[in-house]
Amino acid sequence: MMTQMNYTGKVKRVAIIANGKYQSKRVASKLFSVFKDDPDFYLSKKNPDIVISIGGDGMLLSAFHMYEKELDKVRFVGIHTGHLGFYTDYRDFEVDKLIDNLRKDKGEQISYPILKVAITLDDGRVVKARALNEATVKRIEKTMVADVIINHVKFESFRGDGISVSTPTGSTAYNKSLGGAVLHPTIEALQLTEISSLNNRVFRTLGSSIIIPKKDKIELVPKRLGIYTISIDNKTYQLKNVTKVEYFIDDEKIHFVSSPSHTSFWKRVKDAFIGEIDS
């Protein structure tokens, strides 16, 4: 969905976030040198209007989590300095094009849904998080046994390595490698995909990815106490005695700078997984 922020006559506050690779540092240095003397821009990592991520999708995920509490005020734009990145609109040799587009920018944005996760521990504490791609729950040392509940109704009893819940844009990441479907981000939904489920005459699950609409809620209720590995995008945590994990579509969205260089979702999918097709 395309919307617009009001930037009329406003100096744009820009944060530049780069990984440690040589080419990323070169790109960041060029951007710093241009923006520091430009009266239309103000370089600041505090309360930015625009966050420029330099690196790859992992760097964009890190930038998202740096500013996940300011999503209503921030727009992101990615520059890729390696192989093609799914979230990036610019390559490292297109810095001048990015600068020109930002100078012409009128606040237009492309918005994608994100995931909200609430993890309840046995002492009553609730750990909350947001994910741009996916959240996974695994129990490494033993088979994970958990009830999957949709809208307060038990759907199935799961036995296997774990469960992944992804956003539409995250459907092209780990979810796809698990055999899940690719979901267009204008469809505000979550996708639940099993990780190595046990299916036989005794234990059965649906065995297919499930698409959950925005108004619905997924709950995962582990049946055994112990240590669970929970991943939120590119961050992994070891949590003891998890009693419930809840998943929702967040009311907030991530916003990307919309410009002539913004790549459509299906072109991103084609470039990432198919490439050029011989006629």
UniProtKB/Swiss-Prot annotation:
Taxonomic superkingdom: Bacteria
Record: active site: D57
Reactions that this protein is recorded to catalyse: NAD(+) + ATP = ADP + NADP(+) + H(+)
Coiled coil ranges: none
Any one GO cellular component localisation term in the record: cytoplasm
Subcellular location: Cytoplasm
Keywords: ATP-binding, Cytoplasm, Kinase, NAD, NADP, Nucleotide-binding, Transferase
Cofactor: a divalent metal cation
Residues annotated for NAD(+) binding in this entry: D57, G58, N133, E134, R159, D161, T172, A173, Y174, N175, K176, S177
Keyword Transmembrane helix: no
InterPro entries: ATP-NAD_kinase_N, ATP-NAD_kinase_PpnK-typ_C, NAD/diacylglycerol_kinase_sf, NADK
Major localization class: cytoplasm
Statement: the UniProt record of this protein carries the keyword Lipid metabolism: no
One Gene Ontology MF term: NAD+ kinase activity
Function noted in UniProt: Involved in the regulation of the intracellular balance of NAD and NADP, and is a key enzyme in the biosynthesis of NADP. Catalyzes specifically the phosphorylation on 2'-hydroxyl of the adenosine moiety of NAD to yield NADP.
Protein family according to the UniProt entry: Belongs to the NAD kinase family.
Protein name from the UniProt record: NAD kinase
Source organism: Streptococcus pyogenes serotype M28 (strain MGAS6180)
